[in-house]
């Protein structure tokens, strides 16, 4: 394995890490805001219906008055308008539920607060998906251009390449990995989370808990999903960056890659078993011989270019090929990407 390529991959890993850390700040902020809004919803509910800061389950199951139902339906219209601002597509199921709610003639207090909590949860997941999509788009472009640049500078020759459009990145994101795409993975726990939120709420009513005690239980339930979301984001980032590198290899006529696991100080057994092995680009299979192989996987690939050195001789003067000097990445972007 070339030290040159190991150093390049280490640099790329650092750049990707910066994107991940920035996303995690956003994710933390989103979850904290969701918890804050759920607590506010709960406080309003207790202020309206509690006696001595307690609400019985029987009290919670009482039907809303016509005035309360009318106010709820106005809120539902606001929910629909706000959720339509997000690009996330999996919000549609809840939007359909909201549309149905506008025609209901009987709704209980418990159903009303659960609808409000589900709105907050849906808004959280939609925000999370939009933020992850943005991170993945940046990661894909960064990995793609970095790989093409390093190949061209190393070989001294380049091949015309297609710039990764937003649609191309979205297509890569929507490809199923282990049976699901990244959006499905974000939303798959929504029903379970919602059921757990309702369970904690119902337990609070049955046990005579205060709004503060119930709010703590709701926050704990939501925070349990945060760590899963963080793991998902890092694993999918590894996936999208390796997909981008693979496409970059193909764009420069590189036909083989080497599996590289040693950049990860906590290398798993499955990744160690593939470290240093060479595979054909045309036979790359995610989760099999192309990272990620497991959650939090940090393995990557490097191009096998020994057999491609003849590109320097063969390419000069041919259409679609051009000589590349020892230029900086910034200069390369200006000459070949931003032109």
Predicted segments, located by residue:
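Structured, charged N-terminal subsegments at the starts of enzyme catalytic cores
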Residues: 98-219
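Activation/maturation switch segments at domain boundaries
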Residues: 1-136, 220-221, 227, 234-339
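A broad detector of short, well-ordered amphipathic alpha-helices
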Residues: 202, 231-234
């Amino acid at each position: 394995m070339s030290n040159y390529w190991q150093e390049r991959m280490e640099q790329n890993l650092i750049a990707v890490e910066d994107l991940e850390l920035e996303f995690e700040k956003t994710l933390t902020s989103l979850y904290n805001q969701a918890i804050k809004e759920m607590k506010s919803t709960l406080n309003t509910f207790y202020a309206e219906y509690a006696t001595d800061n307690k609400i019985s389950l029987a009290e919670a199951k009482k039907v809303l008055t016509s005035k309360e139902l009318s106010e709820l339906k106005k809120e539902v219209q606001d929910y629909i308008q706000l959720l339509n601002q997000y690009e996330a597509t999996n919000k549609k199921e809840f939007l359909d539920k909201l549309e149905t709610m506008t025609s209901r003639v009987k709704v209980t207090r418990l159903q009303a607060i659960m609808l409000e909590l589900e709105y907050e949860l849906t808004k959280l997941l939609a925000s999370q998906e939009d933020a992850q999509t943005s991170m993945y788009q940046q990661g894909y472009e960064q990995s793609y251009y970095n790989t093409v640049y390093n190949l061209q500078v190393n070989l001294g020759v380049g091949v015309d390449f297609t710039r990764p459009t937003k649609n191309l990145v979205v297509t890569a994101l929507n490809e199923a990995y282990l049976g699901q795409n990244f959006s499905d993975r974000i939303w798959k726990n929504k029903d379970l989370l919602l059921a757990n939120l309702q369970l904690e709420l119902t337990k609070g009513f049955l046990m005579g808990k205060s709004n503060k005690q119930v709010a703590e239980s709701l926050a704990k339930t939501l925070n349990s999903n945060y760590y899963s979301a963080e793991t998902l984001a890092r694993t999918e980032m590894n996936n999208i960056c390796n997909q981008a590198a693979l496409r970059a290899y193909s764009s420069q006529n590189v036909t083989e890659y080497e599996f590289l696991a040693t950049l990860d100080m906590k290398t798993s057994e499955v990744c160690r078993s593939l470290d240093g092995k060479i595979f054909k680009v045309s036979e790359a299979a995610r989760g099999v011989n192309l990272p990620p192989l497991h959650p939090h996987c940090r393995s990557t690939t490097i191009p096998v270019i020994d057999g491609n050195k003849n590109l320097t001789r063969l390419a000069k003067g041919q259409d679609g090929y051009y000589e590349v000097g020892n230029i900086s990445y910034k200069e390369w972007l200006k000459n070949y990407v931003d032109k």
